[in-house]
Design a protein with these regions (language model features):
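The beta1-alpha1 cofactor-binding region of Rossmann-like NAD(H)/NADP(H)-dependent oxidoreductases
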Residues: 45, 66-77, 108
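Residue(s) in the substrate-gating loop at a strand-loop-helix junction
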Residues: 146
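Substrate-binding pocket helix/loop in short-chain dehydrogenase/reductase
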Residues: 102-103, 110-115, 141
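Active-site helix of classical SDR
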Residues: 126, 162
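Conserved glycine-rich cofactor-binding loop
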Residues: 12, 19-21
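Conserved glycine-rich Rossmann-like NAD(P)H-binding loop of the short-chain dehydrogenase/reductase
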Residues: 35-49
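Active-site loop immediately N-terminal to the catalytic Tyr-X3-Lys motif
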Residues: 104, 151-157
Length: 174
């Protein structure tokens, strides 16, 4: 049993974007609270040492390659996760990217990369995982946002738009 304030023993959590930063912090907190983890990143090899760290907390963990911009990658991740764990209880939609530059310099490719990763990817990962949560009649989806969803910052136009979209999407799905 976990010593944490919120006991998640017996639950499985998927955290997208766990190769570094916030994703690793979220995964550590979930593991310390007793959850087993599905760690995801575009580069599975970048997760392997972190997977061992999670296992050192006495939790089960797997590392799965996931590009949230690719529907087949999402489908494969869910299949691998479901095969490894009997249920998928928690999703932390954390994967994201940013290209910080003045609006006048943002390219079509920059815009698509940011929106496809941060907004479209979050939606379709949530959709795929929610189908499994509905079968079990239990699940929690946490979408990671940003203050840029409510305040404008120079050089963060596409990023702010994507996070504003996440904010609206989250309210719509709730």
């Amino acid at each position: 049993m976990s010593d944490a304030l919120f006991d998640l023993t017996g639950h499985t959590a998927i955290v997208t974007g766990t190769s570094r930063g916030l994703g690793q912090h979220f995964a550590r907190a979930l593991a310390k609270s007793g959850a087993d983890l599905v760690l995801t990143s575009r580069c599975r090899e970048s997760l392997l040492s972190f997977e061992e760290e999670i296992k050192s907390f006495g939790r089960r963990a797997i590392s799965v390659e996931l590009d949230v911009r690719d529907q087949q990658s999402i489908k494969r991740m869910v299949e691998v996760a479901e095969a490894a764990f009997s249920h998928l209880d928690i999703l932390v939609n954390n994967a994201g990217c940013n290209v910080r530059k003045p609006a006048i310099d943002v390219t079509w490719e920059d815009w698509n990369l940011i929106l496809d990763t941060n907004l479209r990817g979050s939606f379709f990962v949530a959709q795929a995982v929610a189908q499994h949560m509905i079968k079990r009649q239990y699940g929690r989806i946490i979408n990671i946002g940003s203050v840029t969803s409510v305040a404008g910052y120079a050089g963060l136009g596409p990023y702010g738009a994507s996070r504003g979209g996440i904010r609206q999407l989250t309210m719509s799905l709730a």
